[in-house]
């Protein structure tokens, strides 16, 4: 199995630990919840996207993945347009265009009773030379931890998500080789999956 991301800047999983926090508890986590209601927040080059289950019971009792069990919410932010020609994010742009959407998504999660959110960021965040400042801004202003995905993590996540959610799942499982190309707003991932 091979995955290639054609974006040039990456995350070093050893040294960039401050960019690797994923989980944020929105409820009091000093009282652990047996079956927390969770959400995924994706901060992409083009948008901020939220996905959470209508009911975890429906998701986990279903024999296969079904988008009908989830509530998708997304807002176009054009985050990548805040990067200058040196790949530095204009923080005024970020605070005006992106941060309000993240804060609004947090309000939605609280209203929907989400206990924990897993937040990931992709190419624009990974590429930004001031990515630490961006992540700190999100943490201080929205109180949300964010994990910037490495190029490989983004490729593998795309391949996994497509593999469980596509109507061509059977064909993928029966194929000896599968090639996937994900052209996103700020990166292109090429994933090759070999069975056996």
What are these regions (language model features)?
Residues 2-36, 41:
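Non-catalytic pre-domain segments flanking phosphatase-related domains
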Residues 7, 14-16, 171, 175, ...:
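Compositionally biased, intrinsically disordered low-complexity segments
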Residues 19-33, 149-179:
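Conserved phosphate-binding catalytic cores of ATP/NTP-utilizing and phosphoryl-transfer enzymes
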Residues 32-145:
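Conserved phosphate-binding loops in N-terminal lobes of ATP-dependent enzymes
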Residues 41-47, 180-187, 195:
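A short acidic Gly-Thr/Ser loop motif
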Residues 99-108, 112, 166-186:
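A broadly tuned preference for mixed-charge, low-complexity surface segments
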Residues 125-135, 139-145, 151-159, 164-165, ...:
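Short histidine
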């Amino acid at each position: 199995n091979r995955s290639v991301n054609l974006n040039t800047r990456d995350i070093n999983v050893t040294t960039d630990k401050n960019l690797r926090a994923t989980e944020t508890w929105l409820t009091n986590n000093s009282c652990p919840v047996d079956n927390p209601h969770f959400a995924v927040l994706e901060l992409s080059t083009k948008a901020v996207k939220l996905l959470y289950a209508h009911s975890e019971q429906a998701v986990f009792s279903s024999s296969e993945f079904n988008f009908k069990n989830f509530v998708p919410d997304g807002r176009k932010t054009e985050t990548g347009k805040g990067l200058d020609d040196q790949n530095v994010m204009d923080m005024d742009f970020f605070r005006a265009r992106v941060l309000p959407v993240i804060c609004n998504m947090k309000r939605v999660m609280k209203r929907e009773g989400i206990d924990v959110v897993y937040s990931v960021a992709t190419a624009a965040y990974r590429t930004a030379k001031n990515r630490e400042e961006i992540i700190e801004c999100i943490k201080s202003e929205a109180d949300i931890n964010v994990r910037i995905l490495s190029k490989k993590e983004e490729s593998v996540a795309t391949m996994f998500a497509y593999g469980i959610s596509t109507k061509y799942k059977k064909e993928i499982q029966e194929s000896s080789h599968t090639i996937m190309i994900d052209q996103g707003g700020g990166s292109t991932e090429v994933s090759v999956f070999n069975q056996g």
